[in-house]
Amino acid sequence: MTVVQESWNFNGRKRGFRKLFDPKNLLRFLRQFFKKGGPMSLSEYLDDRLVVFLDVHSQGDAIESLIEALDGAHKLKDKPAFHKAILDREKIVSTGIGLGVAIPHAKLSGYEEFFIAIGIQCGRGIEWNSLDGSQVHLIFMIGGPDNRQTEYLKILSRLTMAIKESERRKSLLKATSAKQVIDLFKGC
């Protein structure tokens, strides 16, 4: 079944019908849109300057370390505003999603591109008030524009699918270089 809408001229005459969408085409589009390894890849948003091997004791220290890396890589337009947005989001509900992973994020006006900073905490985990009660070892801090929700959801979806794989999480914790970390996201 195809969904259509009547189309009218400016003078009030009926022009005919306009095809809005065909469910088969819509389903195909959505599959392609969210397909693993499709047109968008997480590696597009990664930068070796934004991979941080952490040795911190608190959530605040981890957040600060990643924000410092973002600022050092000139990704932040307003460091205090970004920091505040990250903390404000964390107050709403913990970004500790479970499996030892946290995804703090902020979308602000004035940004043109998304970016992801990765924090890897080897050894003891970080208390993050995670949904499953686990301590955090992997942190993915996402930042970018507030007017591109679709792209943001794609990034979040791809990242979530990638980190669900336990072997990838184990490999991330064993990585010793930023290149190794970024290589683990090729094709994601």
Regions found by a protein language model. Name each.
Residues 4-5:
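N-terminal non-cleavable signal-anchor helices
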Residues 13-188:
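Cytosolic covalent-transfer regions centered on His/Cys nucleophiles
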